[in-house]
Regions:
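Glycine-rich helix-loop-beta junction characteristic of Rossmann-like nucleotide cofactor-binding loops
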Residues: 9-14, 36, 80
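Conserved class I S-adenosyl-L-methionine
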Residues: 16-25
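Conserved SAM-binding loop of SAM-dependent methyltransferases across substrates and taxa
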Residues: 26-39
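Helix-to-beta-strand junctions that scaffold the AdoMet/dcAdoMet cofactor pocket
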Residues: 37-38, 65, 106-110
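Short beta-strand element of Class I
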Residues: 40-44
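S-adenosyl-L-methionine
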Residues: 46-95
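C-terminal substrate-binding/active-site "lid" region of AdoMet-derived donor-dependent transferases
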Residues: 96-166
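C-terminal lobe and adjacent flexible extensions of AdoMet/dcAdoMet transferase-like proteins
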Residues: 170-174
């Protein structure tokens, strides 16, 4: 959750946009995207597993956001139906394998984002983005540290979730 707001900003997600994602999962990113694109936008969400997609759909229905999302059940190796997305968030195990398909789905100047748990994935994805002509590529990690709010003992809390993943962003250029 600490990463989602930053992802939306870095990918320029705004009302009225056509945004894609692959790797729907429980739908937490889908919910954030659907909220950000507003009533006039559309999220197209690809997932490979029916039970996972069903869970995400239920979560969006509970929040009244399901009408903003087109759910598609498909192995993304086959590519995507769309070719004019403003942005694409890829949350799959080997994102570097799907960069050509993502590139084909994005409009020129379209934003790309992904989350990667390991350095190995970062390296492979960077190489793939370079190979397929993405620009303005950035990699970062967000660290959130909470503090005890006792005025007499202001200090960091005893525990902290440090690493959720590396975030990577880029833009499709011609």
């Amino acid at each position: 959750p600490k990463d989602i707001g930053y992802i939306l900003i870095m990918m320029g997600i705004a009302p009225g946009q056509r945004v894609m994602e692959a790797g729907t999962g429980s739908g937490s990113m889908t919910i954030a995207l659907a909220t950000a694109i507003g009533l006039e936008g559309k999220v197209i969400s690809y997932e490979q597993k029916q039970d996972t997609q069903n869970l995400a759909r239920k979560n969006l229905e509970r929040l009244g956001l399901a009408s903003r999302v087109d759910f598609k059940l498909r192995d993304i190796k086959e590519g995507f139906d769309e070719t004019d997305a403003d942005a694409f968030f890829l949350d799959v195990q080997n994102p570097y394998d799907y960069i050509p398909q993502v590139r084909a789905a994005l409009k020129p100047g379209g934003f790309f984002g992904t989350i990667l748990p390991t350095f190995n994935q970062v390296e492979k994805t960077l190489n793939s983005l370079k190979k397929y002509n993405f620009a303005f590529v950035e990699v970062c990690e967000l660290i959130l540290r909470h503090y005890k709010s006792d005025p007499n003992r202001i200090r960091p809390t005893d525990r902290m979730v440090a690493h959720t993943g590396f975030l990577m962003f880029g833009r499709k250029i011609e």
